């Protein structure tokens, strides 16, 4: 299981480095979608079935629609891949070397500090009629988002509305 997680982590880093090395929008979108799929697999590996499914359906579904539309609008006759030019290949290799250097630098410190700790199981216990039971943390996360993070949902909805309004105003024309 450790090898699977290590392989998925390497694929995730390579996907994001491949996206950030600025190839053609078609290949950049492909790298981002592949990185999203690998991220879903990492979440599933940690036991987050609900969160992995939500991320796969909503996040990747939306990304495929957006990247399909933008790739159709920015189509090139000869799209630039990661190996077609020296600059893009150099950016990709430098990004990978920096990522490996960062991992080696972090591994040099012998400890990892946990910033958030859940020491109380009271948040995850459900009290029913005569007994009590536990709820999985990923399925209660959606309820916690709308309960404790309702301001975040409002801000995210308002941001999406303003973004759509700005795009409509820009593309409307006179």
From Swiss-Prot:
Coiled coil: none
Assembly description: Core subunit of respiratory chain NADH dehydrogenase (Complex I) which is composed of 45 different subunits.
Keyword NAD: yes
InterPro entries according to UniProt: ComplexI_Subunit6 (IPR050269), NADH_UbQ/plastoQ_OxRdtase_su6 (IPR001457)
Catalytic activity: a ubiquinone + NADH + 5 H(+)(in) = a ubiquinol + NAD(+) + 4 H(+)(out)
One Gene Ontology CC term in the entry: mitochondrial inner membrane
Keywords: Electron transport, Membrane, Mitochondrion, Mitochondrion inner membrane, NAD, Respiratory chain, Translocase, Transmembrane, Transmembrane helix, Transport, Ubiquinone
Protein name: NADH-ubiquinone oxidoreductase chain 6
GO molecular function, one term: NADH dehydrogenase (ubiquinone) activity
Organism: Papio hamadryas (Hamadryas baboon)
Highest rank taxon of the organism: Eukaryota
Gene Ontology terms describing biological process: mitochondrial electron transport, NADH to ubiquinone; mitochondrial respiratory chain complex I assembly
EC number(s) on file: 7.1.1.2
Protein family: Belongs to the complex I subunit 6 family.
Record-annotated membrane-spanning stretches: 1-21, 24-44, 47-67, 86-106, 151-171
Subcellular location field: Mitochondrion inner membrane
Top-tier EC class: translocase
Function: Core subunit of the mitochondrial membrane respiratory chain NADH dehydrogenase (Complex I) which catalyzes electron transfer from NADH through the respiratory chain, using ubiquinone as an electron acceptor. Essential for the catalytic activity and assembly of complex I.
Membrane topology of the entry: Multi-pass membrane protein
């Amino acid at each position: 299981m450790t090898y699977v997680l290590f392989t998925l982590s390497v694929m995730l880093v390579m996907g994001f480095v491949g996206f950030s090395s600025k190839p053609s929008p078609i290949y950049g979108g492909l790298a981002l979608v592949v990185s999203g799929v690998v991220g879903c697999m990492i979440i599933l590996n940690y036991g987050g079935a609900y969160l992995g499914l939500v991320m796969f359906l909503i996040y990747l579904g939306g990304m495929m629609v957006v990247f399909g539309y933008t790739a159709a609008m920015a189509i090139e006759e000869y799209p630039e891949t990661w190996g077609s030019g020296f600059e893009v290949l150099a950016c990709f290799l430098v990004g990978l070397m920096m990522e490996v250097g960062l991992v080696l630098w972090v591994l040099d410190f012998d400890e990892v500090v946990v910033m958030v700790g859940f020491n109380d199981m009271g948040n995850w216990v459900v009290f029913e009629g005569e007994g009590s039971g536990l709820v999985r943390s990923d399925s209660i996360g959606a309820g916690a988002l709308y309960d404790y993070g309702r301001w975040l949902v409002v801000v995210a909805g308002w941001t999406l509305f303003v973004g759509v309004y700005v795009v409509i105003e820009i593309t409307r024309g006179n």
